[in-house]
């Protein structure tokens, strides 16, 4: 299983070991979700101010959040599907707030590693079409998150 992950660290605080952890968690998720080899995702680490700007500009919520996902496969109104015979599948972009991840790890009483793995996985599942807008969808998404985290060894 080979997922291509492009990391961008705007905070200059993210250690290589954290990127390796995220790579391993997302590889496990891709395997469990039967995502084809060569699919691509980008992961950008930002501070609270930057994620607040993105949240405001794209989601009309003027506050910082922990993770934002931009799925490349979601069709917008009036967009045409572009089919590339030999192009790898681009799943989308994940944007993770490092300060928020640290705050939440402390708040929930678990490690920063676990929180970072959780946030990356949560965003990744959104890229795959999972959501939690309804109670039924939430149950499905959170159940799948739990399965993958436990299979990886990051369960609670």
UniProtKB/Swiss-Prot annotation:
<keyword id="KW-0378">Hydrolase</keyword>
<feature type="binding site">
    <location>
        <position position="132"/>
    </location>
    <ligand>
        <name>Zn(2+)</name>
    </ligand>
</feature>
<keyword id="KW-0479">Metal-binding</keyword>
<keyword id="KW-0963">Cytoplasm</keyword>
<dbReference type="GO" id="GO:0006364">
    <property type="term" value="P:rRNA processing"/>
</dbReference>
<feature type="binding site">
    <location>
        <position position="126"/>
    </location>
    <ligand>
        <name>Zn(2+)</name>
    </ligand>
</feature>
<dbReference type="GO" id="GO:0004521">
    <property type="term" value="F:RNA endonuclease activity"/>
</dbReference>
<protein>
    <recommendedName>
        <fullName>Endoribonuclease YbeY</fullName>
        <ecNumber>3.1.-.-</ecNumber>
    </recommendedName>
</protein>
<keyword id="KW-0540">Nuclease</keyword>
<dbReference type="InterPro" id="IPR002036">
    <property type="entry name" value="YbeY"/>
</dbReference>
<dbReference type="GO" id="GO:0008270">
    <property type="term" value="F:zinc ion binding"/>
</dbReference>
<keyword id="KW-0698">rRNA processing</keyword>
<comment type="function">
    <text>Single strand-specific metallo-endoribonuclease involved in late-stage 70S ribosome quality control and in maturation of the 3' terminus of the 16S rRNA.</text>
</comment>
<dbReference type="InterPro" id="IPR023091">
    <property type="entry name" value="MetalPrtase_cat_dom_sf_prd"/>
</dbReference>
<keyword id="KW-0255">Endonuclease</keyword>
<dbReference type="Pfam" id="PF02130">
    <property type="entry name" value="YbeY"/>
</dbReference>
<keyword id="KW-0690">Ribosome biogenesis</keyword>
<dbReference type="GO" id="GO:0005737">
    <property type="term" value="C:cytoplasm"/>
</dbReference>
<dbReference type="GO" id="GO:0004222">
    <property type="term" value="F:metalloendopeptidase activity"/>
</dbReference>
<feature type="binding site">
    <location>
        <position position="122"/>
    </location>
    <ligand>
        <name>Zn(2+)</name>
    </ligand>
</feature>
<dbReference type="InterPro" id="IPR020549">
    <property type="entry name" value="YbeY_CS"/>
</dbReference>
<comment type="similarity">
    <text>Belongs to the endoribonuclease YbeY family.</text>
</comment>
<keyword id="KW-0862">Zinc</keyword>
């Amino acid at each position: 299983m080979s997922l291509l992950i492009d990391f961008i660290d705007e905070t200059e605080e993210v250690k290589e070991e954290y990127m390796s952890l995220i790579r391993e968690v997302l590889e496990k998720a891709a395997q469990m979700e039967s995502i084809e080899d060569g699919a691509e995702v980008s992961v950008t680490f930002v501070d609270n101010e930057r994620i607040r700007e993105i949240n405001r500009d794209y989601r009309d919520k003027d506050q910082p959040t922990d993770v934002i996902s931009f799925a490349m496969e979601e069709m917008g109104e009036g967009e045409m599907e572009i089919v590339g015979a030999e192009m790898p599948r681009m799943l989308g972009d994940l944007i993770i707030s490092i300060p928020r991840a640290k705050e939440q790890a402390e708040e929930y009483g678990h490690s920063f590693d676990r929180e970072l793995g959780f946030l990356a996985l949560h965003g990744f599942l959104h890229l795959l079409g999972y959501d939690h807008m309804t109670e039924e969808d939430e149950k499905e998404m959170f159940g799948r998150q739990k399965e993958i985290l436990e299979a990886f060894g990051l369960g609670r």
